[in-house]
Amino acid sequence: MALLRALVCGLLTAWLYCSGLGLPVAPAGRRNPPPAVGQFWHVTDLHLDPTYHITDDHTKVCASSKGANASNPGPFGDVLCDSPYQLILSAFDFIKTSGQEASFMIWTGDSPPHVPVPELSTDTVINVITNMTTTIQSLFPNLQVFPALGNHDYWPQDQLPVVTSKVYNAVANLWKPWLDEEAISTLRRGGFYSQKVTTNPNLRIISLNTNLYYGPNIKTLNKTDPANQFEWLESTLNSSQQNKEKVYIIAHVPVGYLPYSKSITAIREYYNEKLIDIFRKYSDVIAGQFYGHTHRDSIMVLSDKKGSPVNSLFVAPAVTPVKSVSEKQTNNPGVRLFQYDPRDYKLLDVLQYYLNLTEANLKGESIWKLEYILTQTYDIEDLQPESLYGLAKQFAILDSSGVHVQILQDCYIDIHMPWWFAASIAPSPMLDISNSIPPQSPYPLLSFP
């Protein structure tokens, strides 16, 4: 499978800050506001580092820096470290006090830090997930939350098994307040489940364990259907189709190619193709897909075999700001709010929020800000696959002209890699609209010399 990449990473920023170059500025407001709007939050990749602390020895600020000098550690973290608890608490406190009413929250995995395997254990991983779960439950006692397991939510990392395990049992017990008995049962068995939304009885969440398909997972090598999840998924989607339900798919590791590669799928290619086939077959049932893992803000459009767009997929940016020493750039912490039509669960919009980490550390307070509203910034009708596909075609025209490359060169310094992706000539079931630079912030990307 080839993935057509038609959107420049960060082009949106260029629209907003380089208006002198003659590109259109999106008008404010949606063209056709719906009579009612439902909302839900998406948080991902919390990556709590319990060892984080301020010390004069910057090599010892956090275990997740792996001995590297933390660059500018403050109360809300550092770009070479995973999240201190104060950062995670500030994210959830912002959600709680934002004034936005939401029907539910999706939480797509990865609670433990990025540290070498010997520095963790099964009990430590469970303790971190417990900490994050109880934090969410204490702040949102009446909100239904739908978690998905990440590749770091296990020890050793990535090695999630095809049978029940201590971690699967632990999270099943922790997440009982949010799930029914059938969901708990499948969660114990294979780390996945489906569950109706209490406030929206015709909407079902399917939480997949895509870590079973992740390349580094040696537990699933040479298995055609690890934990029988494919069979279960098809059966669940078929039941939803018969019962006239709509489904949101959530998972940690996304389908499709990685945002920084034109040839590497995030999961093993066989499993990727199998999931794509299932998603195409039930595209009339699936109303949206939501992932984490890459820490990058990305959008993909799934097309059917005739090339028509049939599904919208969203990869959310992370709460953790961590990067490796070799990386030049990283993300500010982010959370997002999706809007949907409660009549048919079609996705209408996404509001992306971020925390300027440098500013928060300097001021000693966290002020989360609206980064962008997708439909207003891009001047599209909604988040339906047809709208996103039309947007991608506009960027493909810009891509063929080379205009956007010059825009990025004019608007950014310290760009050491091409922030554009050539369109693939091969037939493509998925169109990747990837945007890894936050588009509206005066500090859109933390950058390093």
Please name every model-derived segment.
Residues 42-44, 103-110, 141-150, 248-252, ...:
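Active-site neighborhood of phospho(di)ester-bond hydrolases with catalytic His/Asp-centered motifs
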Residues 109-134, 154-171, 259-264, 299-305:
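Metal-dependent catalytic neighborhoods of phosphoester/phosphodiester hydrolases
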Residues 215-230, 238-291:
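Active-site-proximal segments of metal-dependent phosphoesterases and phosphodiesterases across multiple
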Residues 125-139, 166-185, 268, 272-280:
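Acidic, His- and aromatic-enriched active-site or binding-groove loops in soluble protein domains
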Residues 3-22:
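Cleavable N-terminal signal peptides of Sec/SRP-targeted secreted and luminal proteins
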